[in-house]
């Protein structure tokens, strides 16, 4: 929750620095069908687990296998979020940095990306470990293989649709919807392999976005502090309201 709060504040900071009236952007988020669809497709697994947990808290009879399955599917939903859901947006934002645009914002996004990759590693460990240590989870795994794989296929398809949505007005230098969709497939191979799943769709053997790696491993980025702003999380350094009298006379 601490990191999530930092991420939320960081994104808010970025939007405030770009738009004069940021609330207009925030207010349209839930009106964007593509965003709502992506949230609901994964969110339903959390909703299902929440319902089962509530029934158990109320003392109602809860089938143990149903509960185990709800936990297992929610873990995979979390992994889908960390491994796939944000990658197209991350790559698009960082492409601007590669074109020397919004560099300060890109540095913040690089930090958030690194956090998400840590979450991905932790979630993969949990998925692999519960199956090893608990025979009930091992049984659910064998029974739900097709459902789990379909979960990932749905998220991957939605990410590709998001790439089309982002670039519906045209490409930016060095990036377009086709490259991004190849990047999603490339990412899927290693991400699914990490949790013991084979990705059966065609995918590039090498990354379609080579520069993305330096944002994952910041030790590969060499920038003197005086040439760029610090990558510490910063909020509230910009304002969209200023009185004319405050401006210096020239």
Predicted regions: what they are:
Residues 1-250:
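Non-heme di-metal
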């Amino acid at each position: 929750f601490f990191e999530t709060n930092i991420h939320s504040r960081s994104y808010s900071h970025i939007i405030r620095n770009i738009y004069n009236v940021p609330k207009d952007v925030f207010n349209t988020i839930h009106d964007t069908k593509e965003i709502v669809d992506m949230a609901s497709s994964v969110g339903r697994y959390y909703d299902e687990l929440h319902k089962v947990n509530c029934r158990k808290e109320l003392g109602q009879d809860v089938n143990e296998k149903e509960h185990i399955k709800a936990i297992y599917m929610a873990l995979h939903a979390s992994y889908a979020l960390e491994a796939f859901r944000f990658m197209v947006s991350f790559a698009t934002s960082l492409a601007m940095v590669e074109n020397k645009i919004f560099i300060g914002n890109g540095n913040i996004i690089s930090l958030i990306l690194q956090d998400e990759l840590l979450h991905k590693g932790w979630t993969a460990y949990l998925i692999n470990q519960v199956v090893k240590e608990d025979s009930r989870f091992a049984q659910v795994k064998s029974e739900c293989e097709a459902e789990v794989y379909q979960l990932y296929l749905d998220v991957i398809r939605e990410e590709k649709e998001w790439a089309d949505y982002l670039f519906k007005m045209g490409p930016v230098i060095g990036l377009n919807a086709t490259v991004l969709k190849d990047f999603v497939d490339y990412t899927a191979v290693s991400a699914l392999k990490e949790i013991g799943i084979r990705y059966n769709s065609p995918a590039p053997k090498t990354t379609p976005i080579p520069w993305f790696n330096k944002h994952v491993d910041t030790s590969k980025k060499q920038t003197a502090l005086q040439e760029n702003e610090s990558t510490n999380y910063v909020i509230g350094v910009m304002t969209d309201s200023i009185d004319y009298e405050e401006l210096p006379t020239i």
